[in-house]
């Protein structure tokens, strides 16, 4: 999965898919009442990027729906996975459940079209703080209450705070999550970070005893880091330059070992070599 980083406008979505992304990461900011408000990152952000792109969340969802609905004039067949980077740091811990509820209602109406031929992409809810795990509970219970529990088949999870993996596992136990787990690891492209935690996450994924199904590394912009990430056997690379990821995947060392995921690849299934 080649995950276009910080895609917060519909024009950027077209741009990143055009460069080779089959997945995008979108930042979601919340208002004081825990309503998802804008797709917006703000300052500071990755080096070499403009931090200010912003779209009303529901408008973004409508555009995303068109981009992921076969037959629509705006349809991108390649775009199969969306990571919502939920900026819940602005919320009190006790608002996490409400944020999950409101997020589910927004997605149900504007992305899934109330279950009537909505967008087909898989969705990852990426939460920065472990103690906001009730967002997951609120999200799930809302879809169940609305009669659309089936849509949870399209939803996965990530905690993005680089916490200890055993703590992440405990938090998922509390949230009642048993699958559909991606584990992120990374840092802004302005700084360097080693691969030790990525390797620990991959080991958890491959042990058959852990909760992790997939691992992605962010933000990977350099050719050398891209190769290191692939050598560590990650499932996803989040990048500002998807064309570089495509270029490296075409190198002799990688083209027989890796391929770009399609809609037929289940993002919640651990790949077995």
Swiss-Prot record:
| Enzyme Commission designation | 4.6.1.-
The record's subcellular locations are:
Secreted
Top-tier EC class: lyase
Q: Any one cellular component term from GO for this entry? A: extracellular region
A GO MF annotation of the entry reads: phosphoric diester hydrolase activity
The answer to whether UniProt assigns keyword Lyase to this entry is: yes
A Gene Ontology biological process term:
lipid catabolic process
Q: In which tissues is it expressed?
A: Expressed by the venom gland.
For activity, the cofactor(s) needed are:
Mg(2+)
Q: Which domain of life is it from?
A: Eukaryota
Reactions catalysed, semicolon-separated, are: an N-(acyl)-sphingosylphosphocholine = an N-(acyl)-sphingosyl-1,3-cyclic phosphate + choline; an N-(acyl)-sphingosylphosphoethanolamine = an N-(acyl)-sphingosyl-1,3-cyclic phosphate + ethanolamine; a 1-acyl-sn-glycero-3-phosphocholine = a 1-acyl-sn-glycero-2,3-cyclic phosphate + choline; a 1-acyl-sn-glycero-3-phosphoethanolamine = a 1-acyl-sn-glycero-2,3-cyclic phosphate + ethanolamine
Entry annotation: catalytic residues: 5, 41 (nucleophile)
Q: Which cysteines are joined by disulfide bonds?
A: 45-51, 47-190
Q: What is this protein's function? A: Dermonecrotic toxins cleave the phosphodiester linkage between the phosphate and headgroup of certain phospholipids (sphingolipid and lysolipid substrates), forming an alcohol (often choline) and a cyclic phosphate. This toxin acts on sphingomyelin (SM). It may also act on ceramide phosphoethanolamine (CPE), lysophosphatidylcholine (LPC) and lysophosphatidylethanolamine (LPE), but not on lysophosphatidylserine (LPS), and lysophosphatidylglycerol (LPG). It acts by transphosphatidylation, releasing exclusively cyclic phosphate products as second products.
Stated family: Belongs to the arthropod phospholipase D family. Class II subfamily.
Q: Could you identify this protein by its name? A: Dermonecrotic toxin LvSicTox-alphaIC1ai
Organism field: Loxosceles variegata
